[in-house]
């Protein structure tokens, strides 16, 4: 959701107090919100100039490679194509620190495509900030059982291997203070059901190279598949629906439908 807000804040550079702004200004605004972007193209399908001044835009297309959110987190490729935008220009000019999602007159919809390579994933997993956020995310999705594990163990040396055919392998070590490390390997298929529910398919788990009994894995799988619903991550303004999830041996590709809701309780200042 943070990524969507970053892109939206860059797109809002379309409209300024002085009126019409060119594609390059939007490109520059998007670049300024990332640590680095290797390649970037922005195309704006213009409405008549007077409509753009009023905050109305037919369509915005953003495409590029090498989007670095931080020095550790890289997205290999990103494409975004929006439906028509309707921006509250007066509120935009007076926004201060207001969230970008409060600046829309009408809901904004669009298509998003992301590609992340195995190398990018493992580079990100080396960052303590990333592993900390993933631990919090696991606690949020899976509830108290995951939270107890996160509190008890330190996650060490996590590594992802993309196996192709929508299967992945996660290897890591669990370190409990004053105890030996536990080596954990999880291999599973992944898919998306009903556009929001992440499903684990035929998982296998090894702890210290010993297979976890199938009944235990089946019980864990039932619990996980009931709780891995991405809609729980929707915030009040941004919703995400997964249309495609493809994992090959080199990269993970996601295509999604994004909807940014227009504010209902914020009065217009026009």
Where are these regions (language model features)?
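Hydrophobic membrane-insertion alpha-helices, especially the h-region
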Residues: 2-17
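Short amphipathic alpha-helical segments
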Residues: 17-26, 113, 117-130, 212-220, ...
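Alpha-helical transmembrane signal-anchor/signal-peptide segments
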Residues: 22-37
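N-terminal beta-strand/beta-hairpin edge segment
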Residues: 35-120, 131, 135-177
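A general structural signal for short secondary-structure boundary/capping elements
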Residues: 87-89, 105-111, 125-129, 216-219, ...
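Short, highly charged low-complexity linear segments
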Residues: 103, 118-128, 140-141, 229-234, ...
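Extracytoplasmic/luminal low-complexity segments enriched in Pro/Gly and acidic/polar residues
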Residues: 183, 188-270
């Amino acid at each position: 959701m943070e990524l969507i807000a970053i892109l939206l804040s860059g797109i809002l550079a379309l409209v300024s107090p002085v009126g019409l702004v060119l594609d390059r200004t939007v490109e520059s605004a998007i670049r300024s919100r990332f640590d680095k972007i290797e390649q970037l193209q922005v195309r704006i399908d213009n409405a008549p100039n007077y409509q753009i001044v009023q905050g109305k835009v037919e369509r915005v297309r953003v495409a590029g490679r090498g989007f670095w959110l931080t020095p550790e987190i890289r997205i290999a490729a990103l494409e975004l194509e929006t439906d028509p935008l309707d921006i509250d220009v007066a509120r935009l000019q007076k926004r201060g620190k207001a969230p970008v999602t409060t600046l829309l007159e009408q809901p904004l919809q669009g298509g998003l495509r992301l590609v992340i390579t195995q190398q990018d994933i493992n580079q990100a997993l080396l960052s303590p900030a990333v592993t900390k956020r993933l631990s919090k995310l696991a606690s949020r999705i899976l509830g108290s059982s995951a939270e107890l594990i996160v509190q008890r163990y330190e996650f060490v040396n996590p590594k992802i291997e993309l196996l192709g055919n929508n299967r992945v392998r996660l290897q890591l070590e669990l370190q409990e203070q004053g105890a030996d490390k536990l080596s954990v390997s999880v291999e599973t298929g992944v898919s998306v059901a009903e556009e929001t529910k992440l499903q684990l398919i035929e998982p296998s788990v090894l702890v210290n190279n010993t297979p976890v009994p199938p009944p235990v894995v089946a019980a864990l799988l039932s619990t996980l598949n009931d709780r891995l619903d991405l809609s729980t991550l929707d915030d009040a303004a941004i919703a995400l629906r997964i249309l495609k999830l493809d994992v090959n041996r080199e990269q993970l590709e996601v295509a999604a439908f994004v909807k940014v809701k227009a504010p209902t309780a914020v009065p217009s200042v026009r």
